[in-house]
Amino acid sequence: MTTFPAKDDFEKSYETGNAQVLWTTMVADLETSVSAYLKLADHEEYSSLLESVEGGAIRGRYTFIGLKPDIIWRCNGNIPEINRKTLGGVRDGDFEIINKPSLESLTDLFAESMID
């Protein structure tokens, strides 16, 4: 399976701290989005599956599978927290409280994570 960017390019960019997405395309006539997700996620706690809406005949349908995040943002009540140390495993003690309203802190994270 060919991935984009290539593994070496991805690793170089990752080491410099640039946000990026690793992706591939595949014909999925024998696989559903959910079955692919279940195989790839393998019960990982912080995994996600996002699908495009139906009716995307012109541009096709898209599935995004997220695995092993490097940042986790969560909110309990109106207290936002962030964990930037997830690659070695997720521990509650690694979450830091963000002293901003929850929506503002999430907006800041979106801006910080922007991929050109």
Q: Where are the regions that the model predicts?
A:
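Signature of the chorismate-utilizing enzyme
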Residues: M1-D116
